[in-house]
Swiss-Prot record:
The keyword Cytoplasm applies. It is found in: Cytoplasm. Its main location: cytoplasm. This is Ribosome-recycling factor. GO terms for biological process: translational termination. Keywords: Cytoplasm, Protein biosynthesis. PANTHER family: MITOCHONDRIAL RIBOSOME RECYCLING FACTOR PSEUDO 1, RIBOSOME RECYCLING FACTOR. It comes from Dehalococcoides mccartyi (strain CBDB1). InterPro entries: Ribosome_recyc_fac (IPR002661), Ribosome_recyc_fac_dom (IPR023584), RRF_sf (IPR036191). The keyword Mitochondrion does not apply.
Length: 185
């Protein structure tokens, strides 16, 4: 029973870490990457849709990203979505393709991005701690109902803490790597 709770918690924490990784890949570092804009949602046919579902995104060189929609009618919607995003990019629409110039980051913008990284990292850690809390509550209910012993509760609690510490360490490493990438000039 405890193993099921631990496995469920581990899956949830792993999913949370995957979301963090996806969010961090979308934070601008001064180099072009399709991941920078893939997550941006465009209002298309009344439904928020990720750009990568509407267009081909490529990075032909380190300073440009090109977005070529499969349906030209969504060009202006993609352009608006990029302008609304917190990336600070100005799209250049030529009627067929949207080009994004990726300027080098100013020191001020680097600091803003580092704050965003730290904010997302903290949100992820909170989510992991909430998973831990929920799992602990489940185990305590089982102990109260006399389905597991106090020793089992203690062992499960210790294992859960190790799992949580492991995932938080992984999240910290992702955050530190992204911060180091942002600090490179």
């Amino acid at each position: 029973m405890i193993n099921e709770i631990l496995q469920k918690s581990e899956k949830k924490m792993s999913a949370s870490l995957d979301v963090l990784l996806q969010e961090l890949s979308g934070i601008r570092t001064g180099r072009s990457s399709p991941a920078l804009v893939e997550h941006i949602r465009v209002e298309y046919a009344g439904v928020p849709t990720p750009i990568n579902h509407l267009a081909n995104i490529s990075a032909p060189d380190p300073r440009y990203i090109t977005i070529q929609p499969w349906d030209r009618s969504c060009l202006s919607a993609i352009e608006k979505a990029i302008m609304k995003s917190d990336l600070g990019l100005m799209p250049n629409n030529d009627g067929n393709i949207i080009r994004l110039n990726i300027p080098p980051l100013s020191e001020e913008r680097r600091q803003e991005m580092i704050k965003i990284v730290n904010k997302r990292l903290e949100e992820d850690k909170i989510a992991m701690r909430n998973v831990r809390r929920d799992a602990m509550d489940e185990m305590k209910k089982l102990e109260k109902a006399k389905e597991i012993s106090q020793d089992d509760l203690k062992r499960g609690s210790d294992q859960l803490q190790k799992i949580t510490d492991n995932f938080i360490a992984k999240a910290d490493k992702l955050g530190a790597d992204k911060e180091a990438e942002l600090r490179q000039v």
